[in-house]
Amino acid sequence: MTPPASKRACDQCHNLKEKCRRPNTTATCERCHRLRQTCQTARNLAKAGRKPRAATTLLYKLPASSFSPRAESLGVSHSFETTDTTYSNLYSPFDAGLGINPALFPELDRWERHFLNLMKDIVAPSPLDKYLIGSSFHKSHHRSFVQSMLRPAPALKNAAVACAAVLFGDKYTEYTLTSVEVGHRRAALALSELRALKISEEQDLVTALVLGVSMVTFAMHVVDGQPFLISHYTLSLVRPVYQSALRMDPSIMDYLMCLVSTETFECLLTAQTPTLRINEHDRPNVVDRYLGIASSLFAHLYDICAVSSLLRTTGGKMTAQTAQKVEDIRESLEQWKTSPPLNFLERFTVAETTIMLAQAKVLRVAAFLIIHRLYHPFGTHNSEALSFSRLIDMEFDRVLHLTGQSLPCMSFAYLTACFEITGREARTSAIEKSQRVVNFSKQSQRRFQQTLLSMWAAKDAGSQIYWFSLNDILNRKSRTWI
């Protein structure tokens, strides 16, 4: 009777994960015999059972943690404890440094804990801060990030790790390779959990919004990310309970508006209708951490998307009824005014109020420019279009000069202004300036420039392009407008 085949593969087959066929451990296996290789089993026997997470081999050298005892003296850890005591017993090991303390998150490897440890360190400037209005929002946003990691839902933890990885990979070259590996692994888990999520209670709604914003952030930092699809899916999930979101803490609505702006800006370019219409008076006297006091403009941007979609469907036929809809939108925009809270000037710094007022201005002017191009193709009736374009460009210049930073979430407005630019020198200058204006991520800069170059090439070729036909000549891949 032939003896049973050995269950232990030779070293060659083991390394290549090939099936090893041989009668016993001393014989040459079929693969090594065929390839005339030395067949041996010299490696040590592995211990039975699953390997502990702490024993996982890291592909890259782990940098020193940026944790500093100064955080204690500056009151960093206490700022979290005073506002949320639900997980107060967890703050001590967390603030002691995740990179060397696996007790809080035993399921994470050292690299993942290291990224979270860097991200939670509120003492140093964080990549989380770059898309906020200003410093008035930094502490609360950091608190929100930390709390999302400490909640029981594993989806939020996966999303937090994915975001931390790509944010640091985008900013620091020493993290680039590791961030890709860690970020994609955790993002895949988070997206799978987002698809499986059903909203049956308030906490499910919060989880969906935080997950959606986190995954949109991740997608904006990676090649072939799909921020539009993620925002669209999340908003479709949230739409049946939108009225519940309005009754919740305003900071929760900030997350929803982040998704709304991502989807709306893409819909404006592709002549599609967004998932949600945020009514002008849904958020009175509210300051959004991303959009400032410009949230109420999105009702009118939704209406522009709807008309643009109609024009594209009908082949650009501007009927009297459609023209009346466009004029109604224009009139609403002319009457629109900001509605900041009463303590607006006292509550925020001069730089922050400057940024917020400028955000509202450039987005409103961009809406007027789009309406103009619904009537007139690019390259015609340029006088009014160029006036709008210059107004937007000058506002960006003014804010860059006064504050040293760009306008968060307003890259789309700058794009509409740049569409009108002609002349090699002016276009070269616009591309160079986009490095300062579009600063959310390297991928967002690349996508911005690719879209702009495609548009200019189509204009130079003599194509008749209305706003509602932009998608026919632009790259159809999902873009990033932050």
List the model feature ranges, each with a label:
Residues 136-152, 172-179, 272-439, 449-452:
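Cytosolic regulatory protein-protein interaction regions
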